């Protein structure tokens, strides 16, 4: 077994912190497996060396579960003051100093949204007659805007539709990208409503070093993964901005209306644009806003302007739709309603979300069973203790343990999840056992997704992406054919 790299080779305090955590897990596993004494001694020596390097770099002792935030200042790992100053969320950046991740209660206050409480979850269950999705039960979708209006419409047999999207920046999607689509699929099933999915390949062309052809090819590849989530082809329209803008005058007209009613000062304040940003970036928010208005899709909704949409998305997309909600009544449309999700953490910890640009921070939908096992074992941040003895005595910290966080997303059984939480917190379950549980959940989940994706043909993609009339059964949707 290869030694961990020395502290001097780490390029940042966070990397050094993660190296200590990984080396600590190695020491625990060697002791638990009754490895030869010289091998254990060598691993312990490396662990002590890493901790000394950390202290030299940070000016303080390594503390399990408290990754470095400010490398030059003394800090209390989870103090409110630190969290308030370090939490940062916009459509491109998610950052916090807390190992527990973003303080979502504070984000609700900051963004001015409403918490999804037990009363709202119960109302969704009554309206649909279905058990709430685990993402609702566990607070993964935690915030909303005007969800009660959507339920009012549904209960009164009035129409609404779903809108979500994907910015295709690479061929392979990762686990975090699945979250809004898994939930949107459930919403489509229980409410039996049409869905539009925007592929913002124009956005990725503007922000990334891509050609137009690359951006569109990523749209097609990502669409296959989205289709593999099981969406109903008779109720789902997937569209590329680069393609659909030229096919739908109604869509472009809404873009222009939005552009006229939002000033540069407004978008600069909302999105942080600077004088050096290209004009395409400055105008793009109007493109993401336009699908919120039903007459952007005349093949589906004809010229109706009064049909509200519900947008399931990660909370970092909310700035786009705060702008949209401000504009909507001024151009004759209802405000879109929203359901916000938490972020899917990187393997290295909840300080940031999973990123497709860092292969070691992400589990991709193309990963093999072997790659999944290796990534979880090597890179998933642990809330465990430095030694087996300490872990048995004091237990692990589920609030910072990435493997447990991932199980809250993908393990359906509530009772089993609660038992895992109790066992890990009490010390009855070790980090290696928790990681094995996660691996056993993820490997079949991704293998099944890969099998469904393999069955998606180019013809299927074309059918999903062709503008057409969709099938739905609300009384108010009874158009003449």
Swiss-Prot record:
SMART domains: WHEP-TRS. The keyword Cell cycle does not apply. The modification Phosphoserine is found at residue 355. A motif ('KMSKS' region) lies at residues 353-357. Isoform 2 is widely expressed, isoform 1 is found only in embryonic stem cells. Its main location: cytoplasm. Proteolytic cleavage generates 2 forms; T1-TrpRS and T2-TrpRS. Its EC number is 6.1.1.2. It catalyses: tRNA(Trp) + L-tryptophan + ATP = L-tryptophyl-tRNA(Trp) + AMP + diphosphate + H(+). The keyword Ligase applies. Keywords: Aminoacyl-tRNA synthetase, Angiogenesis, ATP-binding, Cytoplasm, Ligase, Nucleotide-binding, Phosphoprotein, Protein biosynthesis. The modification N6-succinyllysine is found at residue 158. It is an enzyme of class 6 (ligase). PANTHER family: TRYPTOPHAN--TRNA LIGASE, CYTOPLASMIC (PTHR10055:SF1), TRYPTOPHANYL-TRNA SYNTHETASE (PTHR10055). Homodimer. Interacts with oxidized form of GAPDH. Catalyzes the attachment of tryptophan to tRNA(Trp) in a two-step reaction: tryptophan is first activated by ATP to form Trp-AMP and then transferred to the acceptor end of the tRNA(Trp). Could also possess an angiostatic activity. This is Tryptophan--tRNA ligase, cytoplasmic. It comes from Mus musculus.
